[in-house]
């Protein structure tokens, strides 16, 4: 899971979600946020999971994941999963675990995606 911060901007983007489980696969990340960015969420694997900058949202996780997308990603020729699993076992799961978790968390992921996408669309109506 990621820890959604208590900032008003975090509530705007994430609604009532506090510790949502999201698809994250980390072995690389940025260390500093842009000037003026609002830090919205973090996790042990990635300190800067999400930030907002003006009307924009930056996420280092996937809310668009589905079992079919996961299957496509895992079937990609030359994929880097075996090396990443060996080098980053705390934040990169084996394919079997990714498939099972995707199916288990699909409904919650779709609900969170609806909240985030609705907040994003509201910025363009404005």
Feature names for model-found ranges:
Residues 1-69:
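Pocket-forming structural segment of enzyme catalytic cores
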Residues 68-126:
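Acyltransferase
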């Amino acid at each position: 899971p990621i820890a959604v911060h208590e900032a008003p901007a975090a509530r705007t983007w994430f609604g009532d979600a506090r510790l949502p489980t999201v698809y994250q696969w980390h072995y690389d990340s940025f260390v500093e946020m842009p000037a003026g960015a609002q830090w919205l969420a973090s996790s042990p694997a990635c300190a800067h999971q999400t930030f907002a900058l003006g009307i924009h949202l930056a996420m280092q996780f996937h809310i668009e994941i589905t079992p079919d997308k996961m299957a496509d990603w895992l079937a990609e020729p030359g994929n880097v999963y075996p090396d990443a699993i060996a080098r980053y076992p705390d934040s990169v799961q084996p394919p079997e675990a990714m498939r099972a978790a995707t199916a288990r968390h699909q409904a919650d992921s779709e609900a969170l995606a609806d909240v985030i996408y609705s907040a994003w669309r509201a910025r363009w109506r404005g």
